[in-house]
Amino acid sequence: MKKFLAVLLLSLVVSSSAWAGGIETTTLFDRKSNPDTSILVGADAEQKARYFPDGKMSGNVLAFLVKIKGREILFDAGLPDGHIAEELKKNGLAAGDVKTILLTHLHRDHYGGLVDADGKAAFPNAEVYVSRAERAYWVDEKKDPNVIRALEQYAGRVQVFEPGDKVMPGVKALDTSGHTPGHVSFLLKSGKDKLLVIGDLIHFSRIQLPLPEVAVKYDVDPAKAVQARKRIFDFACEKRIPMAGMHVPFPGMLNLKKAGAGYEEY
């Protein structure tokens, strides 16, 4: 019975909405994960034990539906067998209603939900936006068959962009490469309101906020990933911009201030 309840709790589909003037953000919960501390890079045994005494960490896979300047945008698509389509339906949006998907990068837990159980486009009317460097890395260099198959379902509807581009009204792409070669974050602006959608700039806030130099084994370039994290977090602290992170504890929002060599929430 206890095992059943645990599975049930991990399978709950929940969402949360927040408004910041002209930006309405809905957090879409896809999956929970509990990796062990062996995936941390740059943290010694004492640090791991201090923040995770039982050796286990708690993580989320999230996506975000954002309404800005009259447009609804889905940021990332979750896992291939996840709950993003269900979450959207709970919020009054059918998969066919999604017209715009912006991807922070092409790891499975961010692009996988682009396809349904039959391998077809889960969002049949959507255009998919991905950075040029990210697409080149996974499609041209790595020739990842799963990425290729997913993007093929959106043939003619995959748009590439460069960091610094205004991808659409109120949305600018920022270079946060390191986790992957083409990883981007997005700076959203509507009037005086701002939001940063940061993808995998952080995975485990319990340790990576006080110790931002800690990376994860999934970072293609750990040193560059750390630099990107510090640069964007410093910017967010200075400008007091909230951040939406795909692996931040639900509902995935961070408001940070500097704390010594690291950061803390306020």
Please describe what each predicted stretch is.
Residues V7-S15:
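Bacterial N-terminal signal peptides
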Residues K89, D97, P124-D175, T180-L256, ...:
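Metallo-beta-lactamase
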Residues A18-A20:
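Boundary at the C-terminal end of the N-terminal hydrophobic targeting segment
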Residues T27-K90, S185-L201:
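Conserved beta-strand hairpin/beta-sheet module of binuclear metal-dependent hydrolase folds
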Residues I73-F75, L102, V128, L195-V197, ...:
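Residue-level marker for buried hydrophobic side chains located in beta-strands
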